[in-house]
């Protein structure tokens, strides 16, 4: 349905599986029709890693840079500050741009910004965001994507569409999308 709505490029900042990488390869080789796909693949998270050294972080990120052929990763609260710094160093060495997950933790967001993570997905878990946080983000040139579909501390935009639109009767969506997905 993406192409039917004029979407020619997609970016998935984190997937639970590697399926999207296969889909991307199939689009790139012309086996299926679809938008260009950029994805991190599965997140680098606390559930899968407990790095004991920079070398362990480098080895783990090789699956992303060499096998998944991704240019970005999404780091999910992967350990203490030292471990997060190792991920950042390993990513830079392998030319992977890491982004972070907001995690409903402003202190975590701030240390990741200070340490040099170039991106954050999801909003800060506070409102309003004051000039000190805005200034730090601007000074470090960190990309800040509030990800309004999944808002921390506020209403999810996804629910807004289900409440205000009748997706089950959208002809184009139903033509290009399996019923179970709608």
Give the label of every model feature segment:
Residues 15-26, 77-90, 128-139:
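Active-site-adjacent beta->alpha loops and helix N-cap segments on the catalytic face
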């Amino acid at each position: 349905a993406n192409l039917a709505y004029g979407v020619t490029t997609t970016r998935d900042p984190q997937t639970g599986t590697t399926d999207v990488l296969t889909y991307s390869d199939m689009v790139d080789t012309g086996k299926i029709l679809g938008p260009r796909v950029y994805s991190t693949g599965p997140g680098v998270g606390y559930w899968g890693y407990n790095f004991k050294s920079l070398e362990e972080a480098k080895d783990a990120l090789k699956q992303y840079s060499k096998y998944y052929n991704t240019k970005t990763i999404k780091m999910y609260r992967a350990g203490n500050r030292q471990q997060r710094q190792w991920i950042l160093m390993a990513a830079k060495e392998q030319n992977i741009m890491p982004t972070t997950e907001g995690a409903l933790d402003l202190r975590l967001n701030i240390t990741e910004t200070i340490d040099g993570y170039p991106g954050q997905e999801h909003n800060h878990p506070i409102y309003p965001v004051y000039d000190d946080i805005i200034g730090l983000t601007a000074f470090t040139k960190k990309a800040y994507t509030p990800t309004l579909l999944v808002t921390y501390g506020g209403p999810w935009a996804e629910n807004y569409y289900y409440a205000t639109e009748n997706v089950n009767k959208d002809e184009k969506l139903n033509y290009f999308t399996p019923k179970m997905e709608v």
